[in-house]
């Protein structure tokens, strides 16, 4: 689906060789990954930050943009095993000659590996969005998570602008364009998590007493603020808006081919809802920014602090300049998602009390701001009035937060258990 969405390949009934080669490259990579498990090797989710140094990572396809603005998948997956893999094989399976002190020899292999700067992050410090190691991520790319997110957003923009009937095979129902659209519209979903781990993040190694590995160090404050800004850029209505031509292409579903968990969950019945994708994308970003564990780490660190996240979200939504057209509808939806997210955190009994207090304070400050506003636009007046109603209702009865229907996210990770 990703290849179909990126390349819009179906000029006629033939399947372009680029798609076949990408599929074969992925199969080869996955085969090497499973052989690695057979040999006893665990995942290394930091490999993507070191030029794809291991097949034991979960690789996201590398998409390049050519000088002419074309999308290039020729190096979507790496060839062969990586340098980290060679080091692990050397350590585990080296056949030492007689008379060699094997323990000392293996220790030298380990010391050399550390000295060469290889990184390793295990499953436990990578899978959850709450984890703090910036290098521990699934389905990400690049040494610079922020730079890679910005690159993926450009790739996404190109693919969405070119999205057409050519994204599905001739003879397929046009509504099934939505299944191809989902992974392209949410192309950045895993890179969002990678950027999020810079916020309140901490670099660390699995040190042993007496080894040469570095101690823990926090992500610099300026870098954390860059990460916050990069994530907020993903909820800009102009970024979330779909081209109107694309929206018009996705007609109501044909009989016996209903919407599924692989499509967006909208509010417009059988008609494609152009706001539903935006709601899903905003939810992906907010669940990273409003993660209770991350928020607590920010509070403990002092700078940039959880206030940097709250103030940034409010500036990007409620306090942003008014939009028009469909952008305004998307902006109002995103604003309410921020409000509900803050209220949810404020009344989350498992969250840190300082985080809860700051979240509730932000909601009350927003309520006071809304009370002073009197926009001319009728839709905005209604939006503000509804927001104030929701603030009063949910503060009086926090249990009602459980009745809110969250954005339904289409499945993302193709594999994901600890053993795969």
PLM feature spans:
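Active-site proximal loops enriched in glycine and acidic residues that flank catalytic Cys/His/Asp
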Residues: 27, 43, 47, 60
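Conserved catalytic/binding loops enriched for acidic/polar residues
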Residues: 17-18, 22, 50-420
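Active-site-proximal segment of zinc-dependent metalloprotease catalytic domains
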Residues: 1-38
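Catalytic Zn2+-binding segment of zinc metalloproteases
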Residues: 35-49
């Amino acid at each position: 689906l990703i290849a179909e969405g990126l390349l819009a390949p179906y000029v006629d009934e033939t399947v372009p060789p680029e798609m076949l080669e990408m599929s074969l490259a992925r199969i080869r990579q996955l085969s090497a990954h499973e052989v690695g498990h057979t040999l006893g090797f665990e995942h290394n989710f930091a490999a993507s930050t070191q030029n794809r140094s291991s097949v034991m990572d979960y690789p996201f396809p590398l998409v390049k943009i050519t000088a002419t603005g074309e999308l290039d998948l020729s190096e979507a997956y790496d060839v062969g095993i990586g340098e980290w893999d060679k080091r692990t094989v050397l350590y585990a399976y080296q056949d030492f000659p007689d008379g060699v002190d094997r323990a000392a020899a293996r220790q030298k292999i380990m010391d050399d590996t550390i000295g060469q700067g290889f990184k390793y992050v295990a499953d436990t410090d990578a899978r959850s969005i709450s984890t703090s190691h910036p290098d521990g991520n699934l389905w990400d790319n690049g040494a610079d998570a922020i730079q890679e997110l910005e690159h993926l957003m450009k790739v996404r923009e190109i693919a969405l602008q070119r999205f057409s009937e050519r994204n599905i095979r001739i003879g397929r129902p046009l509504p099934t364009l939505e299944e191809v659209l989902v992974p392209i519209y949410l192309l950045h979903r895993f890179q969002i998590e990678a950027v999020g781990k810079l916020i309140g993040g901490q670099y660390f190694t699995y040190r042993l007493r007496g080894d040469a590995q570095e101690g823990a160090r926090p992500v610099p404050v300026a870098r954390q603020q860059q990460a916050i800004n990069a994530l907020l850029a993903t909820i800009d209505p102009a970024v979330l808006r779909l081209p109107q031509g694309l929206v018009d292409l996705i007609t109501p579903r044909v009989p016996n081919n209903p919407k599924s968990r692989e499509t967006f969950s909208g509010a417009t019945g059988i008609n494609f809802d152009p706001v539903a994708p935006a709601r899903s994308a905003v939810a992906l970003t907010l669940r990273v920014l409003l993660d209770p564990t991350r928020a607590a780490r920010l509070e403990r660190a002092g700078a940039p602090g959880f206030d940097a996240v709250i103030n940034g979200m409010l500036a990007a939504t409620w306090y942003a300049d008014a939009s028009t057209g469909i952008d305004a509808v998307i902006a109002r939806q995103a604003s309410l998602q921020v409000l509900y997210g803050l209220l949810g955190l404020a009344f989350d009994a498992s969250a840190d009390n300082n985080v809860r207090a700051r979240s509730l304070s932000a909601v009350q400050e927003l309520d006071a701001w809304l009370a002073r506003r009197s926009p001319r636009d009728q839709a905005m007046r209604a939006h503000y009035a509804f927001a104030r109603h929701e603030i009063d209702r949910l503060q009086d009865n926090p249990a009602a937060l459980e009745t809110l229907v969250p954005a339904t996210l289409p499945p993302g990770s193709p594999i994901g258990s600890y053993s795969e």
